[in-house]
UniProtKB/Swiss-Prot annotation:
GO terms for molecular function: GTP binding; GTPase activity; guanosine tetraphosphate binding; ribosome binding; translation elongation factor activity. This is Elongation factor 4. The gene is lepA. Transmembrane segments: none annotated. It holds the Pfam family GTP_EFTU. Keywords: Cell inner membrane, Cell membrane, GTP-binding, Hydrolase, Membrane, Nucleotide-binding, Protein biosynthesis. SMART domains: EFG_C. GO terms for cellular component: plasma membrane.
Length: 603
């Protein structure tokens, strides 16, 4: 089977905000072009969302790809390579990766909700990648749909001409054939030279139990054939190709992949570390010298410790993280130890949803029971002797007297919210030490830009934003700069012992409120022991908040009937002595729920 003529190939991705229907549109495109039969599609929604967790939450986490055959109205046969991308801000890395492999994008906007913050972010990614963009209005069959208003919004906010936007309902299939024609007529074919030396972009890689590492590639020039020896230019590792093929969405093997095509290769690669996303693949015998411009590697923004509840699970956790790292290039981890929690890992994530998803995948796919420590960001510190250091973990913070300056990362947040919730949204941003930059109106919705410290966003900002706006506000952010900050290290002491897993860096003005909220929450969740347990929040040697868990008390005087008071007193004194001793040597068991709840408190 020879590869298709390059003019008849269209590589495109679907960009949209969460829940605007891009995975459903992908289902319809697969169905209409015959990628899967109606029988195979029956009872299956979001075909490309292969993880259970993706279907349950209704979000796309991993970018997926599928190849479709389509006979257009002009009578020619076309090949479409569709990349379904995530919409959530944490997975922007997956988006940029997919966009690098395509020439065009379908911009899907919900006709009842309009342009959202992450729609904007993803469109800008697509424009940066030099894409041709076709606007598609989805859910036009809903009673609340306002297509004309949304078209105007696309023109006002994004600056795209939406006069010939395609009107569809992905759920019912209405207008979807028009999308297929628009892909043919309005998106450009890829460029490439079949006779040139092999040059291909490594788009993604994941681990398959039977095949080893599977690599998703986009061929730019030349041809990839079975049996060919290839070289990864970034890692300098060479392999013999065993299988070459594409997804329909099922894995289908072919003899070769030509320029402009997107497909997969397997080559007995054992280490996913050898396949760096964004790397250039070339022919080992006739290598090219210039690498393709890769995309920027993902930089972890949020760090937290993950520890197994059962210490015997440590090796299982190490293996599980290695496997997830195979499929998720943006996830990083290194070993760490904690006095309270034993051995575990310090992990880096792109954001809080990313953290939650990884944690959930570890517990589901590998049956691990984990404790997560307080999420933190990267702080830069200048010491009094002039040296500079970066801190990922509050436990590593040097002595206060040695620190000349602490700098924390700031972000620029773009929030789109219906007008009636604007006051609550602005108050939330002010409470989080934000500085308002601009406020504009798009119809009945306000678009507000704020500078915020990332430290204030990583805990629960997204949840709070959703609750103050009844779920209507959308949010997107990017890192801007580091600024000096008045931060202090707050520790939580349980029975006078610091719990390192709960220490955190907080702004001095918010330390007391946060400390009080945490100790109150811990008091509710630590079960009573045989002795009194003080729970304290401290900055340095100063206690800023305290709660006490009352002791369980056995009635030692129960069998004394009347008689002399000294007998009772003697028994009570004896009990008191015993409790004193217990408190000295007793160990307090802190349940996992107490850790999780303490980290989720809002000061």
């Amino acid at each position: 089977m020879t590869t298709a003529p390059i003019d008849n190939i269209r590589n495109f991705s679907i960009v949209a905000h969460i829940d605007h229907g891009k995975s459903t549109l992908a289902d319809r495109l697969i169905q209409i072009t015959g990628g899967m039969s109606d029988r195979e599609m029956a009872g299956k929604e979001q075909v490309l969302d292969s993880m259970d967790i993706e279907r349950e939450r209704g979000i796309t986490i991993k970018a997926q790809t599928v190849r479709l055959n389509y006979r257009a109205k002009d009578g020619k046969d076309y090949i479409f390579n569709l990349m379904d991308t995530p919409g959530h801000v944490d997975f922007a890395y997956e988006v940029s990766r997919s966009l690098a492999a395509c020439e065009g994008s379908l911009l899907v906007v919900d006709a009842s909700q309009g342009v959202e913050a992450q729609t904007l972010a993803n469109v800008y990614h697509a424009l940066d990648a030099g894409h041709e963009i076709v606007p598609v209005l989805n859910k036009v069959d809903l009673p609340a749909a306002e297509p004309d208003k949304v078209k105007q919004q696309i023109e006002d906010v994004i600056g795209l001409d939406a006069s010939d936007a395609v009107m569809i309902s992905a759920k019912t299939g209405l207008g979807v054939p028009d999308v297929l024609e628009a892909i043919v007529t309005r998106l450009p074919p890829p460029q490439g030279d079949r006779s040139a030396q092999l040059k291909a972009l490594l788009v993604d890689s994941w681990y398959d139990v039977y095949l080893g590492v599977v690599v998703l590639v986009r061929v730019v020039d030349g041809v990839m054939k079975k049996g060919q020896r290839i070289r990864m230019m970034g890692t300098n590792a060479a392999y013999d190709l065993e299988r070459v093929g594409y997804f329909t969405p099922k894995m289908t093997s072919v003899d070769e992949l030509g320029p402009g095509e997107i497909g997969f290769i397997t080559a007995a690669i054992k280490e996913v570390a050898d396949t760096r996303v964004g790397d250039t693949i070339t022919d080992d015998r006739k290598p090219i010298t210039e690498m393709l411009p890769g995309f920027k590697p993902a930089i972890p923004v949020v760090f937290c410790g993950l520890f197994p509840v059962d210490a015997d699970d440590f090796e299982t956790l190490r293996g599980a993280m290695g496997k997830l790292r195979l499929n998720d290039a943006s996830f990083s981890f290194e070993m760490e130890t904690s006095a309270a929690l034993g051995f575990g890992f310090r992990c880096g994530f792109l954001g809080l949803l990313h953290l939650e998803i990884i944690q959930e995948r570890l517990s589901r796919e590998f049956d691990l029971n984990l404790i997560a420590t307080a999420p933190s960001v990267i702080y830069k510190m200048t010491l009094t002797d002039g040296t500079e250091m970066e801190i990922h973990n509050p436990v590593d913070m040097p002595d206060v007297v040695k620190i000349a300056e602490i700098q924390e990362p700031w972000i620029e947040a773009t929030i789109l919210t219906p007008d009636e919730y604007l006051g609550s949204v602005l108050k939330l941003c002010q409470d989080r030490r934000g500085n308002q930059k601009e406020l504009t109106y798009v119809g009945a919705r306000a678009m507000v830009k704020y500078d915020l410290p990332l430290n204030e966003v990583v805990f629960d900002f997204y949840d709070r934003l959703k609750s103050v706006s009844k779920g209507y506000a959308s949010f997107d952010y990017h890192l801007t700069e580091y600024k000096p900050a008045d931060l202090v290290k707050m520790q939580i002491l349980v029975n006078a012992e610091p719990v390192d897993a709960l220490s955190m860096l907080v702004h001095r003005t918010r330390a007391e409120g946060r400390g009080r909220a945490m100790v109150e929450k811990m008091k509710e969740l630590i079960p009573p022991h045989m002795f009194v347990i003080p729970i304290q929040a401290a900055i340095g040697g100063k206690i800023i908040a305290r709660e006490t868990v009352r002791a369980l008390r056995k009635d030692v005087t129960a069998k004394c009937y009347g008689g002399d008071i000294t007998r009772k007193r003697k028994l009570l004194e004896k009990q008191k002595e015993g409790k004193k001793k217990m408190r000295q040597f007793g160990k307090v068991d802190i349940p996992q729920e107490a850790f999780i709840a303490a980290l989720k408190v809002d000061s």
